[in-house]
Amino acid sequence: MDRVSNLPEEVRCHILSFLPTKHAALTSVLSKSWLNLWKFETNLDIDDSDFLHPEEGKAERDEIRQSFVEFVDGVLALQGDSPIEKFSLKCITGIHPDHVNRWICNVLQRGVSDLYLFTDFSDEDTEEDGGYRLPQEMFVSRTLVKLKLRSEHCVNWWHWDIGASLPNLKSLNIDSDLIFFGEMEKFLSSFPVLEEVHMANMEWRELDETMSSASLTKLSIHGTGVEEFEHPKSISIDTPNLLYLNYSDLVAEDYPLDDEGDVVLQFCNVVKLINGIQNIQTLYLTEDTLEVLTMCCESMPVFNNLKTLGLKSDEGRGWQAVPALLRNCPHLEFLIIEGLLHSVTDKCGDACDCISREDKGRSLISCPVKKLEVRGFRGTIREKEMIRHFLEYFPCLDEMEIDAEENDSTNFEVPRILKVVAYRLHDVVSTEIVGHWQSSAQSGGWSQTQMDEMYYELAPRNKERIYDMFFFMRRASSTVPPPPPQEMSQDYLQMQLEVADLKERQRDQEAKLADLKERLRAMLDMIVDQNPIIASALRAREATNSEREKASSGQEMTEKERDYDALFDIIVEQNPMLASAVRALRATDSERAETSSNQEMTELGQATATYFPPREGE
């Protein structure tokens, strides 16, 4: 007998609750002790894709759909009147709405608390105008605590012509093709203890909406974002206990609010929206919202309760609103920036280091942020300068966490770039560590215990602007970690600085050489196109080069090669532009060869220094 079968029935029922109902029912063939066990499940998860998968086109066959209906009916019949906690139904294969409503009513009568419905009906499936309607029993349930509704089309989620009362509902999530809501105040009043609301693809029926709820703490509204649909001219939000707001839609003309508590909304444009959320504790702003907030930099409210601020940026949007935000967050502790690169303008503000200013870093100096997380770091020069800027002007910064962009071509030598930043920034650097937080266990990596111990040893201290920096690199890496902190001398840091500078200069030089060569090639192509004789000479040279490759390296130049070189020299002398281009191109190739040779010698010297240390007395 296997060990699982010897477990108590309560434990085995709990294990089955994590499986789809169809898979749980299949365990009845294992033994007699499993025969009826699945019938006592309090969590039912029924998914028609599990039942009809994997044969393509199977869902179109009437007998298969009928067998699915019989399966669900059989499961519910076997359980009888036993209590049920959670019922999840995914049904998008053309099942008639009457069957779906019968199943919903069954679990409602048995006291279901969590109900998740993912349904989709065609026009042929629904006989009523306005699409599928949920059973009336669902709107008067006294046991529902969580309700999640999702559909693609032809579903009318709410009955406006009947009364509704769900006294224990705390979480409501509706994601539909279109949600036509009107009389929002009446809608929310049906849920006296509602705490979380999420609505996606929402279209407003009324031009003036009021959302009032004393219990609501989390509100997410995602409109259609299509101008052709109706959008409210005014949204009034009366939610004194609201802690989280996610609003994504075209901006309404007005956002009045009647509440006199913690949140006060009194605005007639976008400025009012930001004023109305000034008492929140966590705020995340997308790149679009960040750009819109440039309109209210001068009237930015003070966020006295804000602890966490997240900003998403891209290269096409500016940072005009960032300085005002940072100056008006007197208790900010955690700052998240997703994407350091942004559009550089003269109104960019002093939060970045893009333009030299006399009042550089003023908004950062007044910001008390303790932890900074940078996401999507690519290792570019601009990003490196931004990191330097933050380290220099955030006075209370204790911890910086950098998430490097995976597999980005510009993300090179990120650990050494951070070494350069920290070393150049401060006159005194006691210890600076760059750690690799590996996404998977790899040879040579640090364990979690080692990371925790090292972090404990390197407690940041800022009183005398002496920093112990600890950077987390959230990326897979096979790089051998740096030595322990007690072995990291100033000489080691200086060596890492020099190596990083050398590699950075080499990359800049290679980029300049590549650009110069591309321009010279373009110039030569233009000259060749305008001079047929030169084109013939170049073709002859290509043929000669091909013959040279076939010949041995010690063979002397043939008479044909000497004649060609003489002809080419004559053509070059007659065309000064071509002569200059050829000389520059040859100089470029020579310089590249010299650089490559110097690099090889440097690497050889490092290798010999590692494996053959100097003897005593040398």
Swiss-Prot record:
Name all F-box domain ranges: 1-47
> At which residues are the LRR repeats?
147-176, 196-223, 224-249, 282-313, 314-339, 354-379
The record ties this protein, via Pfam families, to: F-box (PF00646), LRR_At5g56370 (PF24758)
Annotated signal sequence is none
Question: Keywords on this record?
Answer: Leucine-rich repeat, Repeat
Q: Which InterPro entries match?
A: F-box-like_dom_sf (IPR036047), F-box_AtFBL13-like (IPR053781), F-box_dom (IPR001810), FBD (IPR006566), FBL60-like (IPR055294), LRR_dom_sf (IPR032675), LRR_FXL15/At3g58940/PEG3-like (IPR055411)
Any keyword Transport?
no
Region entry Disordered: which residue ranges?
587-618
Biased composition regions of type Polar residues, renumbered to the chain: 595-609
Q: Which PANTHER family match?
A: RNI-LIKE SUPERFAMILY PROTEIN
The identity of this protein, by name, is F-box/LRR-repeat protein At3g58940
Its organism's taxonomic lineage begins at:
Eukaryota, Viridiplantae, Streptophyta, Embryophyta, Tracheophyta
